[in-house]
A protein has these predicted regions:
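A cross-family phosphate/adenosyl-ligand binding-site feature
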Residues: 2-56, 61, 66-71, 123
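YjeF_N-associated NAD(P)HX repair module
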Residues: 53-151
Length: 151
């Protein structure tokens, strides 16, 4: 989005030192080098109150969530759901809080206007257009053999 001249802010719900996966840490390191992207950390949602957003991209939780959504994630989802954004809310792969296999939601779930999911439609998503909004399926190059053996 920054490459298209848009103002981009990435909000990390926590501290960079607490990032657990090597991949996430590597990606965060790349973001830190980008002058065109503003970074906010710490999970203090009050930091967002003075910012204006055209669109929110939800990437809080992914497809593997289980159990109750803990803080600060639950409050971040509530923040998204109580705001109005000119460009709406776009969920990456699945709205945070939605079980993509069953369509069930946890105690909170992002209400997206658009969901861009990858590889194939998740079984539970068409049942929940109320939280997924318009759904787009984008191919990411997963070969059939990988789907048979892994998925």
């Amino acid at each position: 989005m920054a490459g298209y001249g848009l103002n981009v802010t990435v909000f990390l719900l926590g501290e960079p030192d607490n990032i657990r996966s090597e991949e996430c840490s590597w990606n965060w390191g790349l973001l830190e080098k980008m002058k065109s992207v503003k970074l906010l950390t710490g999970g203090n949602l009050e930091d967002l109150n003075n910012l204006e957003f055209g669109v929110i991209v939800d990437g809080i939780l992914g497809t593997g969530i289980a159990g109750e959504i803990r803080e600060p994630h639950a409050s971040a989802i509530e923040f998204i759901n109580t705001q109005t954004f000119a460009g709406g809310v776009v969920a990456i792969d699945v709205p945070s809080g939605l079980n993509p296999d069953t369509g069930e939601t946890n105690q909170v779930c992002v209400n997206a206007n658009i969901t861009v999911t990858f590889h194939r439609m998740k079984v539970g998503m068409p049942k929940r257009k109320d939280v997924c909004g318009e759904i787009f399926v984008e191919k990411i190059g997963i070969p059939p053999e990988a789907e048979i053996d892994v998925l």
